[in-house]
Amino acid sequence: MRYLELAQLYQKLEKTTMKLIKTRLVADFLKKVPDDHLEFIPYLILGEVFPEWDERELGVGEKLLIKAVAMATGIDAKEIEESVKDTGDLGESIALAVKKKKQKSFFSQPLTIKRVYQTLVKVAETTGEGSQDKKVKYLADLFMDAEPLEAKYLARTILGTMRTGVAEGLLRDAIAMAFHVKVELVERAYMLTSDFGYVAKIAKLEGNEGLAKVQVQLGKPIKPMLAQQAASIRDALLEMGGEAEFEIKYDGARVQVHKDGSKIIVYSRRLENVTRAIPEIVEALKEAIIPEKAIVEGELVAIGENGRPLPFQYVLRRFRRKHNIEEMMEKIPLELNLFDVLYVDGQSLIDTKFIDRRRTLEEIIKQNEKIKVAENLITKKVEEAEAFYKRALEMGHEGLMAKRLDAVYEPGNRGKKWLKIKPTMENLDLVIIGAEWGEGRRAHLFGSFILGAYDPETGEFLEVGKVGSGFTDDDLVEFTKMLKPLIIKEEGKRVWLQPKVVIEVTYQEIQKSPKYRSGFALRFPRFVALRDDKGPEDADTIERIAQLYELQEKMKGKVES
């Protein structure tokens, strides 16, 4: 199958904003895809090469890419760089370079999707001495044979800057449409395996029956079950039917651990493989998890010198560290508090009641200095739960989680079977979709940022306000450097950006607002932290903001409970 067909799909997707049309375009394309291509083409459609949980990365930035294109076309790298000032898009500039390339290959062959994918895999797997030169050569071979349109989208795939508006929800619907299967079965299979390639192949070859049989798989992370916020302990108990399990809500980073014999893999909430960053936790898990095979979930917490928990950003620093890991182990010691078990020795526990999963967790974990089972309390009494809540806060934790005793595990769902109780309104994780240049001494830096909430149905990010406070001068330098390559268009002092970067913000309140399509605006938002443990699709949704608005009004006594 020619790569040009995929490039033409990208072009059509980019030209329409209608979700149904995009879904139909992707579905029609998937129908034509050979069976042996289905495992990787869904990722290419998303503008990616590998699933989020795959450790492999291309490791190719703009300079390396331009070098490869210069080698393939005979056009000077500086000329390509200058062209970006006119086009505003490196993909467009590379397409122009390919269009007027000065050298032709006598052995040129049309690009196939399989060749492109296999070459990108080879690029990702090339490491060590001389790897940069090899990567340039592999990519140059592709651009040598590429049509201008192919070159444009190949460049965007390599840089991770595809702008076709295809998100997980749309791809899910397209798979269901293409192979005439139930969308809820596609959703379920994806939530259990986080692998669209696998799900698409099952949908085509085995239909609804095959999708219904999909189960948890070791080595493929399960989408995490999420919680809503409760107004109080009393409200949480009422929602849970009068009795609930309360456990400490730790201020850390959620992780999912897969054990297969002596092999341990740890995935972040974003489903990224963070195993190498936390070797001491991996070793402790080998001793702590008794079964041969298991999947458990917990919260990784950084511990200060006084034994109290540090803010979650310290854990993220551990995740980001690629070198001098032993040094970081001493500076930022970690502790893992486990709170759920989803799989044991070939048996999925997804459909098992929470109370039984908790008992199993306690049976299969041999606690040690680094690995604990989250402290909990099962009660019907508000007073007991409130005393536990007070103690959790005094210990430096965020608050409590309340869990329905008969709740099954619902991957990817943020329902009311799990509730969090905190002393303040929940902060929001939002995507930066635009920015405005500063003034005076900050004229060369972005001074404020336009915030977007995710709409999973359309894949869009809808504006909910602008944040300019809470940033240090160093923050603004870093954010400007990070965001400049993501500029899509400029309108005076305002720029619009590819929705890639997630930040955590606090705010005074959520207001209803006709000014924004989202219908909501944040009053006095303030920057708290960069959330590079989250991707754009992990950001808070419009629905979530609506829920928090209702909760806020309930707390103020304006809305009947």
UniProtKB/Swiss-Prot annotation:
Catalysed reaction, written as an equation: ATP + (deoxyribonucleotide)n-3'-hydroxyl + 5'-phospho-(deoxyribonucleotide)m = (deoxyribonucleotide)n+m + AMP + diphosphate
Matches recorded under Gene3D superfamilies: DNA ligase, ATP-dependent, N-terminal domain, DNA ligase/mRNA capping enzyme, Nucleic acid-binding proteins
Cofactor requirements of the protein: Mg(2+)
Temperature and activity: Optimum temperature is about 70 degrees Celsius. Active from 4 to 100 degrees Celsius. Thermostable.
A single GO molecular function term of this UniProt record: metal ion binding
Enzyme class name: ligase
The keyword Magnesium is assigned to this record: yes
Protein family per UniProt: Belongs to the ATP-dependent DNA ligase family.
Annotated function: DNA ligase that seals nicks in double-stranded DNA during DNA replication, DNA recombination and DNA repair.
Subunit structure: Monomer.
Protein name per its UniProtKB record: DNA ligase
